[in-house]
Amino acid sequence: MRRAAILAGEVVQSTIGLLKPGIREFEVGAEIEYQMRKRGASGPAFETIVAFGERAALPHARPTAKRLGKNELVVLDLGAILGHYCSDITRTVYMGRAPKRIRIWYGAVLEAQAAAIAAAKSGAACGDVDAAARQVLAGYRLDHLFVHSTGHGLGLEVHEDPRVARGQKKRLEPGNVITIEPGVYSAGIGGIRIEDDVAVHAGRTEVLTRAPRNLIEI
């Protein structure tokens, strides 16, 4: 799984380097799959999510013919299958100079992710990991814009137990691999999501995906 996660991080970074005004979502999606296979993946772990501008407000947006414009958010959510194991990573970038509101929102999501990763220890209830992310976003008055769970299990399938969601009492165990993917979404503005794969070990956690998490402005 570590290799699949590293591969996904490499692909998302190479894809960000290709973004430019006028490129279409489905062109980016096709490039992502090409880059995966070029690096040895047997294919994508799920249908790649590519969303520009207002469409980034859709957490599960599929690539369309929409062209990338200036001053738009870009959400890239992708995963690869390598050695039968799945990975899952999301990064959000901004085409242009991000306005203050986007910077604040991005910082809040990044802080929420860090809090959830810190909470994702062996023995922790999955609902408490989810709550850690929501508590941070509530501090920014953004929790109402977080419309999905914080994460899910990952392995031979892209969605497995445990669910990192509200009220989940199941406790994390060494050997679990989960995603941590808080996000905020607003119609007319777009969305911001940051996702990484986290392995739970006895006494520590390990982030398997390797790609910069800072706000990238193109």
Cite the ranges covered by each PLM segment:
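Active-site neighborhoods and metal-handling regions in enzymes and metal-associated proteins
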Residues: 1-218
